[in-house]
């Protein structure tokens, strides 16, 4: 562990170059404003430790104010030692740090979801709470270029459509997330820590094949890299194309919605055809809006409508970034294609069940999405 906050000019040249590459990525690709306040999500692993070091080195140049949070998931016997490591790291880097406890097993048992999903949900919820407490503009995460490759495969197995299939966003203003290291190789981050004499914690659960992400990283990705040694570079190029396409579609859809806005309703009293489900909050895409759009644009509007009903506080007509892990917010491509086919053929009596307790149906050339609630 370093004894005092480091300075960029005092670290090895290779380490300094990496930091400047991250700075360039933050300024040119992420639009990070000078003077930003960032909350760092730190686990003590190599990625998040490198995140803390790099941003601390860049803080004077970018006029950053840094805070940190370590979430103790309580899933491993040495999780308390991980949190203690993060506190010591932040003390040496002169970064204020808090530790929050997460009852992952309790959420998993009460909600009927997996441990991995429960941990992710609680972690992001606690990060958002802490962000608000410390007044940070964004939460900085330690995802790196290798995580993009894993994420693309995860999304592929979930049936995620394009451009969300291209992987996680480097900046997500809806959830106030920032990923400064997303263009940086994982080994380069470890080399940085070694060059600066900083250790990190190893999480043994990262080697467990109990979790899908680990199975993909440990078993599937090595096979794909044998077939294509440049796989990570290829998937990063895919990620870049996805970001361009996403920006284009957001601009196009925002323009269309400015002319013919969607209609948000608070629900209806009558029961559905099933007679056991009442209408909850609804969103209608008007016929005049849909009639002038290409099917590709309509499909993206359907996805945006689903996200709005799942996340009404952030899902209006803003950026349509995908939410990895929030399966209920990811409408399956097959269902949306069937919905659009029914619209094109004028089949108005068909109802479509979507993830997250949502339903869609046609009404006079319009498409209505609604959240279903149990009938009284």
Q: What label would you give each PLM region?
A:
Residues 206-213, 234-243:
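Internal, active-site/partner-interface "lid" segment
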Residues 218-219, 223-235:
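Conserved anion/nucleotide-ligand pocket segment
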């Amino acid at each position: 562990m370093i004894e005092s906050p480091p300075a960029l000019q005092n670290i090895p040249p290779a380490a300094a170059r990496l930091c400047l590459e991250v700075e360039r990525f933050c300024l040119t690709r992420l639009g990070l404003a000078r003077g930003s306040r960032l909350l760092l999500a730190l686990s003590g692993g190599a990625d998040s430790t490198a995140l803390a070091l790099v941003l601390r080195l860049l803080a004077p140049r970018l006029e950053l104010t840094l805070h940190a949070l370590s979430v103790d998931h309580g899933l491993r016997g040495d999780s308390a030692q991980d949190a203690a490591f993060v506190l010591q790291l932040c003390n040496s880097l002169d970064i204020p740090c808090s530790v929050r406890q997460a009852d992952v097993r309790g959420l998993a048992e009460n909600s009927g979801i997996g441990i991995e999903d429960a941990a992710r949900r609680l972690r992001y919820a606690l990060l958002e709470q802490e962000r608000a407490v410390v007044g940070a503009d964004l939460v900085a995460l330690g995802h790196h270029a290798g995580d993009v490759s894993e994420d693309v495969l995860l999304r592929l197995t979930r049936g995620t459509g394009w451009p969300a299939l291209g992987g996680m966003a480097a900046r997500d203003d809806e959830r106030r997330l920032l990923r400064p290291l997303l263009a940086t190789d994982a080994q380069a981050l470890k080399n940085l820590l070694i060059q600066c004499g900083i250790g990190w914690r190893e999480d043994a659960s990262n080697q467990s094949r109990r979790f899908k992400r680990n199975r993909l990283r440990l078993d599937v990705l090595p096979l794909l890299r044998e077939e294509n040694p440049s796989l990570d570079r290829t998937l990063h190029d895919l990620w870049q194309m996805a970001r361009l396409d996403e920006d284009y579609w957001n601009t196009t859809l925002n323009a269309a919605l400015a002319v013919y806005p969607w209609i948000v309703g608070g629900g209806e009293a009558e029961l559905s055809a099933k007679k056991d489900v009442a209408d909850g909050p609804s969103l209608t895409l008007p016929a005049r809006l849909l009639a002038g759009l290409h099917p590709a644009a309509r499909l993206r509007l359907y996805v945006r409508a689903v996200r709005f009903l799942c996340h009404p506080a952030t899902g209006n007509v803003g950026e349509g970034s995908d939410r990895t892990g929030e399966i209920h917010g990811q409408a399956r491509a097959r269902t949306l294609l069937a919905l659009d086919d029914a619209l094109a053929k004028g089949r108005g009596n068909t109802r479509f069940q979507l993830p997250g307790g949502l339903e869609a149906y046609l009404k006079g050339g319009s498409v209505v999405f609604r959240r279903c609630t149990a009938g009284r």
